[in-house]
Amino acid sequence: MTYLEFRTQLFDLGCFSIRQVYAWQPDFDRNNLTRWIKKGLLVRLRQEYFAFPEYLRRPDFAQYIANRIYRPSYISLHTALSFYGLIPEAVVQITSVSTLKTATFRNPFGEYSYKSIKSGLMFGYEPRPMADGRTLLFATPEKALLDLLYLYPFYDKEEELEQLRLDEDYMQEELDRERLGEYLGRFRSKALEKRTAVLMKIYEL
């Protein structure tokens, strides 16, 4: 098989796994992948996941990969809060939550961090369209906040929560308090309820 044949078949997927390759060509020689990576014709994303280097220049594609290389997962926590303008800092890692174990990956597209949650807490995310028509799974602002408070329990006092420097205008004018309350109830966590109460007190919600 030539690289051109391989690229023609798989390029539109954006990123792909070795399983997808074998589903297409059961007798595929995986040594080809090693050679093509060395030549710069492919990018290794993590074990058994790959992409074409042309996608390095595409907007939002680094976030799209986050959904694909560790599933099920959705983007949340600091990356989502930064996207919505709730926190002022630019986020280096692309942060997600998943029902799989906590993990971190690095590749040419960036650094990916996944925090583990129970399967019953995999809700509160929506498909967000990308420029090229693909979609990626992204937490709502309310779920991103609750995921953060749930997974980082040291945010339990006013001093710690104030260090997040959440945007006051967003908190008071755009945050959906009804949705926040609904999501909070689904966690069934007294500790999270206490942390959320402190947060609401700070921002007079």
Positions of predicted regions on the chain:
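Structural motif detector for alpha-helix initiation sites
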Residues: 3, 18, 77, 141-142
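A residue-level signal for beta-strand positions that form part of recognition/binding surfaces
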Residues: 15, 111, 163
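Short beta-edge/loop segments at beta->alpha junctions of small alpha/beta modules
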Residues: 1-72, 108
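Short coil/loop linkers at secondary-structure junctions
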Residues: 27-29, 87, 190
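Hydrophobic/aromatic-lined pockets within catalytic cores
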Residues: 26, 85, 150-154
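A short, terminal or domain-edge coil/loop segment
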Residues: 15-17, 94-108, 142-156
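Hydrophobic alpha-helical interaction segments
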Residues: 125-205
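Short gly/ser-rich loop at a beta-strand->alpha-helix junction or flexible surface loop bordering the NTP-binding
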Residues: 37, 43-52, 62-123
